[in-house]
Amino acid sequence: MKIEVNLDNNRLPDKYTRHAAVEYMEHDFPVVSFPFSIKDVPAGTKEIAFALTDLDSIPVCGFEWIHWLVAGLDGHDVDVPEDSSRNNPLNWTQGYNSSAGHIYDMKDQPISQHYMGPKPPSGVHDYTLTVYALNTKLNFNDGFWYNELIHNMAGHIIEKVKIDLPVENN
């Protein structure tokens, strides 16, 4: 299985990051999700789930920041279109990102269950998109947590792939 994302000078394009135009922002965060493709999905895959996280946030806030959580994607090759987090053309479920936690306390805001784009405070952060091919359907509703996803995937992961998407605060 592989993930394909179009980068701009080896970085996630500005439109999907802290450098986005104001019309692509909500609560001072970018909200237009980037397009990408998932190819060569293994046989027997019933569902695809993915997470976009930032390990480089650990020195900043003390934990891996969750930017986007999705489950319920059909288990075959797929092109995920731009802004699919807000438009949901693939009929998936979305979990809580880190804005729903106690630091931002935005659990009641729509952004808490959608793409919350990268906003590194300094330097370059690598945002990791991890895609999971699963041999079962998880049947989540919107508003699940990352730990629930991890626990429910245990023993059901056929394949897992990652890609790092650098974003620079310049």
Residue ranges and their predicted role:
Residues M1-N170:
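N-terminus-centered regions that define maturation/targeting leaders and the start
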